[in-house]
């Protein structure tokens, strides 16, 4: 039996294959009697396995048959556990301790559950016991008279062939029939409705398109608001996470809602009110179920006459009315789609357009659409099913008959959603159903990453590789098919249109939840001790303990039998990992306030010899065992948290495919032994040894590599590292994705990595070389040889008009982010045929100098431009040929202005932008954002360029010297920015402003590597700064040295962009420092080649919500 593990067959397929392997494995010498016993056990299992398969395809089996199938499935798990216990050898030390620390030496390898290797006679007796259990199951099959399969007719199962046309999620073209609602809501969002805070609601039944409309409005109008947030609520929302998600977005921080773990609900409310005071904000709460949730959240939103708006979506009209204060004018009741709009959605999904629908299917299509009742979710679900095999007449006939019989003449909209989703589910092949039912491990409304699900499905054994495709390709197909059928709801989509994260629509959740219980596949326990699923023999257990400190596991669960554990909640509520002896999948996601307890003890995992997947995330410190090489089956190790120490034998895990640790983590020497690795993130070039850098070249199976640089080094050290990594990359022939990012750099550094481009594999698909450490002098010509490249993000100091020709050799490029520090004398001209499949183009430069010829970028959908304007510049004719971009849908522009730019300049630039957009034959979604182009948008090299142009000795970059009035305003703000003990430092501040060399220490909230990189980049961009360093035990002290730095302005900038910032010290530097921490010269010597692209790190405000786990749209 080649079947994978599944909800219907249990572990029968993997068990039979495992017995086969035992019988033929040359390294396992079985005594003849034991071998014969295993052969007989296998024969007995095959016999009942055939009956199990026959009964599993019956739509509604009898109670006796269901009972027997449950018993056999459980027996398959039990026997596989016994086989694993008998034949899987333990190696390594107890509890992960080094051999030198053990009190008692262990002379022989141990087996889980046994103190020593069992004797052959013991194993033969155990095999005999297992055979007896199988015979009993076979006898019950006969006693229950289940030999002849009976029950209702089996559902028709249709295997997807991959031809379904996915919807382009998030694109306005997919929203049909909502023009009236959009017009009304657009007016409500505008200033015409008055300055007071307004609350509106979109109401309608499940599947009618409320979330899609709210997302569309958010995309269109977010730029009009200084603060904005889009969050998703669930039926039992954790208010701490919900409010934390809103706060993280309105503050525009690169942090998740979990970063507010120690904050109480009241403190989050207070912080939100303080931050939103006197600001215009837009808050969208999607899927509100209870007014109690609204009453708490609403207390965080001040009404300050700032034209702020709040939008909610709800299924229940009474909830919407209470949120809107019973103002019926602000209730938008969505109605089902009309006939024409329904046809547009349906035919576009199944055939591409109505014109491509065969004539013989027109009538049956109309019948199906009539039964769908105009509900978008129902239409998409049925269209996704039919689109998998659009030319299969049996499928069309089956769908039509099912809908006609189950929905009758006047079905309710609720019945329509239920039956269409039920049809889509029943038509799924068993492996697809298994993967869907597995999502019962996650809380209702949880955002799930596609990459995580794929690895978990693989670790659970839900897929079996074949000669044509490996496991990763198969699970990718499963995921995409569940999305295409409307069963999984996309949340985050990248620029290529690929779904990165998803959630279960609550209507789908309601459909599959009973199936979780019926098939005894998973069991969920929440903080209220509510049990979802069977409480007898649990194989997959999910604990949701996020709302109480004293939640405990319910009684009656045998933890030693659990194969998969997912924990969501408080650290001090998590059961001991050591009790779960047979774990294969371990998911730990910590929420809420942990108090003083921050340490997560994962030392017992060294005894989980069947473990295949381990992921943990949260604001905790993870303690791993000193030795981990006993986990011979481990495929995925992802720790999104701080690690106290990495096991020294990590490099000896033979089956590890995916390794992800936070940057700044030093891996043990010998990484070249990890030849099975496919994913490595992050590998820190500054913290790892040169031997490890060279060892990377041995990882010939590596496909995804994310490099970071988080430690300072001498120029000599940088060159050694560069040579080592260049040599290694030249040998990674299977590499598909390469990313190099700054990480949590503690010093501003720069080195030329042009040599890397010349050695990367020609089949590379993704290349991101991010500033500040990756700034090319010129665009490397060798980039044009990477013909398979799909994603390219790169920054250069100087980009010549002829360099664009290097990109014409990239026929597969779909995403291009390009930043140039210096504008060319001419224009960048994209000619006919250039970048034929490009969908997203982001271009940043000091001046806008682009031209598109007819035929250029024929598939470009989104265009993002970043440039500066200055006083009295001419703004017309800065962007040529936008009308030639025939597929363009969105254009976003971010324009930097300095203090010399007047209102007339802004109006002129805005008028020119609108005029350019209006040239396009289509009605484009457009946005224009103004930012201060002080040092936020300039780079040190740009500043030097402007200094030379102006002949200024003081040199203030793009900005002219502050006026006396501005200086006085800053002096007035000194008291609010200084810490209390520095209230008498005004004289030192004045000395700093006069140009004397000054050392400034600021305490900044920098919880992660990205936030540190951002804070350093901000500080480094300020006029007069010579060096920037991060110090302090918690890495929260920013030390800035330079001349003429305004401390008040520096702190104000950091406070605005990073949240919390406090000035701790300002002192005059008498003489040049000569020692770095660690004894190296040049502590305060500024690296003049440091540059920061506003492209990826200094983007104010972000183009979309930072919270990826609740973000309805992705702009990357």
UniProtKB/Swiss-Prot annotation:
Entry keyword set: ATP-binding, Coiled coil, Cytoplasm, Leucine-rich repeat, Nucleotide-binding, Plant defense, Repeat
SUPFAM superfamilies: L domain-like (SSF52058), P-loop containing nucleoside triphosphate hydrolases (SSF52540)
Subcellular location: Cytoplasm
LRR repeats: 608-631, 633-653, 654-675, 677-701, 732-755, 786-808, 810-830, 835-857, 858-882
Biased composition (Basic and acidic residues): 958-971
Tissue spec. comment: Expressed in leaves.
Gene3D superfamilies per record: 1.20.5.4130, 3.30.70.100, Helical domain of apoptotic protease-activating factors, P-loop containing nucleotide triphosphate hydrolases, Ribonuclease Inhibitor
GO molecular function: ADP binding; ATP binding; metal ion binding
Domain NB-ARC: 182-466
Domain of life: Eukaryota
HMA domain: residues covered: 997-1066
Region of interest called Structured coiled coil (CC) domain, as start-end residue ranges on this chain: 1-177
InterPro entries in the cross-refs: Apaf_helical, Disease_R_plants, HMA_dom, LRR_dom_sf, LRR_R13L4/SHOC2-like, NB-ARC, P-loop_NTPase, Rx_N
Keyword flag Transmembrane: no
GO biological process, any: plant-type hypersensitive response
Region (HMA-like domain): 1000-1070
Subunit comment: Forms homodimer or heterodimer with RGA4 through its coiled coil (CC) domain. Interacts with AVR1-Pia and AVR-CO39 through its C-terminal part containing the HMA-like domain.
Function: Disease resistance (R) protein that recognizes the AVR-Pia and AVR1-CO39 effector avirulence proteins from M.oryzae. Resistance proteins guard the plant against pathogens that contain an appropriate avirulence protein via an indirect interaction with this avirulence protein. That triggers a defense system including the hypersensitive response, which restricts the pathogen growth. Contribution of RGA4 is required to recognize the effector avirulence proteins AVR-Pia and AVR1-CO39 from M.oryzae. Acts as a repressor of the RGA4-mediated cell death activation.
Domain remarks: The HMA-like (RATX1) domain is responsible for the specific recognition of AVR effectors.
Full protein name: Disease resistance protein RGA5
Encoding gene per record: RGA5
